[in-house]
């Protein structure tokens, strides 16, 4: 410390007004760890911030989900299989902007810009051909609305005689993030909220 006051050297204050203690321990008390540790939120409870199951990741480790972003459904299908062969444990499909917006590939400004173009049910059949979705979880971020992609995946699985209830994974959407990112939505926000609530 070289003669400097302990409080000025050991306690760091950020410009937001947060003071960092020099060390945090379980015995520090309410002035430190009690403020930063969650008290009412555990895995499988509350807002599920710490996981959807009580055991968290103890029983099932985190998945390895390399994003597959080939433009054509057949190429993306081959890449999905390749990633599983190379150690991925989750099918992770990235769709292009036009697909996320529900625009036909023929009318798209930049088809395949960030992922696979899926316009029709046949495209989804090609994309999911030979994938063991009852064994390996499936992941897709669908932009503002997941309803269309969810319907296409479910229809494809049913057509192949698969039990949709045995499929694990997520076809997610985040209309707020899309609104912030692009400044507009292709559907009313209220409709998207209702869709997510169902």
Predicted regions and their residues:
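Catalytic alpha/beta active-site cores
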Residues: 1-198
């Amino acid at each position: 410390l070289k003669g400097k006051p302990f409080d000025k050297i050991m306690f760091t204050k950020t410009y937001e007004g947060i003071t960092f203690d020099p060390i945090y321990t379980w015995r520090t008390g309410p002035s430190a760890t009690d403020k930063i540790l969650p008290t009412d939120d555990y895995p499988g409870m509350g807002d599920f911030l710490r996981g959807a199951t009580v055991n968290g990741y103890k029983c099932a480790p985190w998945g390895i989900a390399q994003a597959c972003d080939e433009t054509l459904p057949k190429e993306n299908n081959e890449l999905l299989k390749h990633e599983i062969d190379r150690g991925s444990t989750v099918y992770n499909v990235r769709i292009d902007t036009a697909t996320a917006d529900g625009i036909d590939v023929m009318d798209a400004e930049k088809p395949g810009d960030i992922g696979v173009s899926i316009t029709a049910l046949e495209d989804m059949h090609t994309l999911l051909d030979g994938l063991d979705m009852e064994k390996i979880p499936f992941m897709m971020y669908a932009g503002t609305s997941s309803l269309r992609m969810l319907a296409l995946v479910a229809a494809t699985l049913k057509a192949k005689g698969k039990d949709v209830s045995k499929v694990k994974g997520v076809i997610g959407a985040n209309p707020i993030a899309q609104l912030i990112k692009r400044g507009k939505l292709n559907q009313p926000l209220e409709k998207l909220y209702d869709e997510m609530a169902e």
